[in-house]
Amino acid sequence: MTASIIDGKVIAADLRARVAFEVARVKRDHGLTPGLAVVLVGSDPASEVYVRSKHKQTQAAGMASFEHVLPADVAQPDLLALVARLNADPAVHGILVQLPLPKGLDTETIVAAIDPAKDVDGLHPHNAGRLAGGLPALSPCTPLGCIILTKSVHSSLEGMDAIVIGRSNLVGRPLVQLLLNENATVTIAHSRSRNLPELCRRADLVYAAVGKAEMVRGDWLKPGATVIDVGITRRPAADGKTRLIGDVAFDEAMEVAGAVTPVPGGVGQMTVACLLVNTLRAACAIKGLPAPGV
């Protein structure tokens, strides 16, 4: 068996196009231009690249993009004051503070200061609590992207056995809640789980999100399983550059699984696309409009 590759580039491009269509519609029908504000603290190169990508894709979708770059030594009260101004700005419907923050800044305090209605990262305790309760909420972008990728293979996840390897607040825990909302049967595993390979072999859906390169081997997988690889590890290559490696041994998985996301070109492509989805949804909710068709 050779698995099919779940092409995150193609699926993300389609999602961005649908977002752009809906943005044009709400502009035309309601005079609403969704706006996303991104706050970058410091000059981490990886974060700078990610923020530039967000800015470019936000504008391409027809949304307003607002960038705020602060020095790494910014005082926490000053950062909180910026968040308060963005909360009050009617042109801003989504606020994202790029993580991780430099030392000396309390991430929980900053995230909790964001208006939950504008929390397009889905990390505010209000949104996390609603998601855990099975209520409508802005969901973290990477887990949301994982669900969309999975549903490109399976129209319904109802009754399927899923395993999520990783229990972070950013990916693992919210992904479990989204899978439960799809009526999947979910096991959450982590670094202290016993018999992890055996647990994986039972699963129709495998989500690897631990950040340990090639941890999930081919013989861990149930034949025909769908494998969503969230992990990213940078490994030195022979040419002196670095290459990205996922949490799944890709070549081995391709011989056993039914469908696999590559790294790069899989989940990462979906994260910014889902950020646009959340911004559009937030804008419509804030303005009291019906939920958009994405």
Swiss-Prot record:
Its EC number is 1.5.1.5, 3.5.4.9. Keywords: Amino-acid biosynthesis, Histidine biosynthesis, Hydrolase, Methionine biosynthesis, Multifunctional enzyme, NADP, One-carbon metabolism, Oxidoreductase, Purine biosynthesis. Pfam families: THF_DHG_CYH, THF_DHG_CYH_C. NADP(+) binds at residues 166-168, 191, 232. Gene3D superfamilies: Leucine Dehydrogenase, chain A, domain 1 (3.40.50.10860), NAD(P)-binding Rossmann-like Domain (3.40.50.720). It catalyses: (6R)-5,10-methylene-5,6,7,8-tetrahydrofolate + NADP(+) = (6R)-5,10-methenyltetrahydrofolate + NADPH; (6R)-5,10-methenyltetrahydrofolate + H2O = (6R)-10-formyltetrahydrofolate + H(+). GO terms for cellular component: cytosol. One of its GO terms (molecular function) is methenyltetrahydrofolate cyclohydrolase activity. Pathway: One-carbon metabolism; tetrahydrofolate interconversion. CDD domains: NAD_bind_m-THF_DH_Cyclohyd. InterPro entries: Aminoacid_DH-like_N_sf, NAD(P)-bd_dom_sf, THF_DH/CycHdrlase, THF_DH/CycHdrlase_cat_dom, THF_DH/CycHdrlase_CS, THF_DH/CycHdrlase_NAD-bd_dom. GO terms for biological process: L-histidine biosynthetic process; methionine biosynthetic process; purine nucleotide biosynthetic process; tetrahydrofolate interconversion. Homodimer. Belongs to the tetrahydrofolate dehydrogenase/cyclohydrolase family. Catalyzes the oxidation of 5,10-methylenetetrahydrofolate to 5,10-methenyltetrahydrofolate and then the hydrolysis of 5,10-methenyltetrahydrofolate to 10-formyltetrahydrofolate. This is Bifunctional protein FolD. It comes from Nitrobacter hamburgensis (strain DSM 10229 / NCIMB 13809 / X14).
